[in-house]
Amino acid sequence: AVTIEYVSSDCVGVNARNVFAASPSSNKVFSIEAANNNLWVVYGGYNLSFDPLNKKFGYSHYNGSSTESTLWVNKAYDPAFPAQDLVHITIDPSADNKAYLSSWGSGMMVVDQDEPVVIWDDSNSGLEDLYQDGEPESSIRVNGAAFDNRGNFWITNAWVPNKLKKLETNGNWKGFDLSSIITETVALGLTELAIDKTGSVWIGSRRNGALVYNESGDRKRALNTQGTSGSLPDLNVRTLAVDRNNRIWIGTLKGLVVFSDAESLFELDIYDAEPVIIDDNGVPKKLLGDQPVNSIAIDGAENKWFGTDTGGALGTNPSGSQTLYNFNKDNSPLPSNSILKIKVDNSTGKVYFATDKGIVAFNSEVAPYGDALGEVYAYPNPVKKEHEFSRTEFDLLFDDSGNFSPPEIVENKENEKRVEE
């Protein structure tokens, strides 16, 4: 049986067994993060030009392991901790109930036990303000962040000289100047950050491609649209993911590419990423074509998940050569084809899709860390475009009011599935 949970959407009328009354505070989601049966949600943002939206919506946290009666905690904007435009969540790898919330304007908010503890800004951390001292305005624009395997915390800090920051385990801050690999000096927005198996930090950008930094030797390189130096389909890099083979999956405004030699990146004269070529009824085509790719996630079995701007979500095998799932608003409970973010909780096998109309969770039944595959893979393989997915294969996390009344449900004795009356 599958639980359908309405959390933040304007969709109703879906087959369900159970429904959570509690939910996130809004269906206007900007980003999510998931791990160990915990889901975090933020609602801030920026526009396509990376201008702050000045949203003061706080954050939400679902703790599936909580013994409390309410599993969802919603925190409104707090003037005592005035972080607005929260755009990214980094869960502490050693504490599921501690998270670092990036703010596109206020720095970074540290949350522990669901309560804000401190906001890191230019007065108490290594983060920099894009405005100079003495100027009346302030804007500390932080986005992608991640912990490396040694516990160091890497953070993007846009529109300042040292665009990459590192908080070491001893509490020291370092800043790294990436200006030598920046070619577009006006559109300086930064997106996601990922760390590969060699310790290189990969950063997506609005118009500077993929920026790569390795602290060992202070090595820097950028992948752009030029042949021999990246061959990206577009300089707007929206998402990055690193798989177990240290391949870098790069989603751009105009499609997907993969860079397969991260270990040798700084020694290569030619360092081009390549599209994934699939067989479409005997015709070779690029996986996802020229679609904008907003998010890439990798599950415990190394399957790849792609969220597109207008085409819904796609799940593939580890190489990307075979489609396992093709979800859209017509064949699944997705409330929209605009996928903002995909995150996988490898402890539960759930794949979370944040759309512009709410959040959906799909039970992939991939065992933790890829130990086994569930019967979920009995779908048509490859998936046909017209294939419809049963709504009972999803958890739906929707509710734009926080007071959802579950639909009346009855048992269908013929197929032992719950159906809506």
Segments the model singles out, each with a brief description of its role:
Residues E388, D395-E421:
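C-terminal outer-membrane/trafficking sorting elements
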Residues A1-Y379, E386-R391, L397-F398:
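Carboxylate-rich, polar loop motifs that coordinate divalent cations or form catalytic acidic clusters
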